[in-house]
């Protein structure tokens, strides 16, 4: 596997920045609690399907207290179009109760505390810290796990390994948005089956590993 040198890495992020100066996540949310819920719901589901369900849900429950009052059964009625909704509903009710009991109904700005909540893993915690609190974490999803090694930004084979590589090689000035740049690039350009190399802003920089 070929990897980019530091000059090449910087050029990659310069191009991604030029193409999309202010990348945005595609999940809809209103506060850090609704962000946490939306990210939890997005596991093995599309952002579009989550947004469709949460548009109505967040009108009636956008705080831990309101979600707990809604209850698991009624929550299921809002999210039943989302994959694994019974398990996700159970976890959302449980984490709402824990947020009230342990964190004064506030979403904690701490990775360890976030990962102690029901259903919240390392990737979810990183997304919430980045999008909700402006911390330059890099959450590695399936798109980033595929795309970062293709480009030559990482030789990792697991999400944690790719995350470690990206935190090392990504220039500080690009770290805040690195997650979204690579994710969106993988979702819309460097796709799994038919990467759109001829249309790619990185075509002259990319290592094209495993393509």
Swiss-Prot record:
GO molecular function: 4 iron, 4 sulfur cluster binding; class I DNA-(apurinic or apyrimidinic site) endonuclease activity; DNA binding; DNA N-glycosylase activity; metal ion binding
Domain HhH: from-to ranges: 111-130
Record's catalysed reaction(s): 2'-deoxyribonucleotide-(2'-deoxyribose 5'-phosphate)-2'-deoxyribonucleotide-DNA = a 3'-end 2'-deoxyribonucleotide-(2,3-dehydro-2,3-deoxyribose 5'-phosphate)-DNA + a 5'-end 5'-phospho-2'-deoxyribonucleoside-DNA + H(+)
Taxonomy, superkingdom: Bacteria
Annotated GO biological process: base-excision repair, AP site formation
Cofactor binding remark: Binds 1 [4Fe-4S] cluster.
PROSITE patterns: ENDONUCLEASE_III_1, ENDONUCLEASE_III_2
SMART domains noted in UniProt: ENDO3c (SM00478), FES (SM00525)
Keyword DNA-binding: yes
UniProt: [4Fe-4S] cluster binding residues: 190, 197, 200, 206
Keyword Hydrolase appears in the UniProt entry: yes
Cofactor(s) needed for function: [4Fe-4S] cluster
InterPro entries: DNA_glycosylase (IPR011257), Endonuclease-III-like_CS2 (IPR004036), Endonuclease3_FeS-loop_motif (IPR003651), Endouclease-III_FeS-bd_BS (IPR004035), HhH-GPD_domain (IPR003265), HhH_base_excis_C (IPR023170), Nth (IPR005759)
EC numbers: 4.2.99.18
Any Pfam family hit: HhH-GPD
Keywords attached to this entry: 4Fe-4S, DNA damage, DNA repair, DNA-binding, Glycosidase, Hydrolase, Iron, Iron-sulfur, Lyase, Metal-binding
Entry-linked SUPFAM superfamilies: DNA-glycosylase
Family note: Belongs to the Nth/MutY family.
Protein task: DNA repair enzyme that has both DNA N-glycosylase activity and AP-lyase activity. The DNA N-glycosylase activity releases various damaged pyrimidines from DNA by cleaving the N-glycosidic bond, leaving an AP (apurinic/apyrimidinic) site. The AP-lyase activity cleaves the phosphodiester bond 3' to the AP site by a beta-elimination, leaving a 3'-terminal unsaturated sugar and a product with a terminal 5'-phosphate.
Name listed for the protein in its UniProt record: Endonuclease III
Natural source organism: Treponema pallidum (strain Nichols)
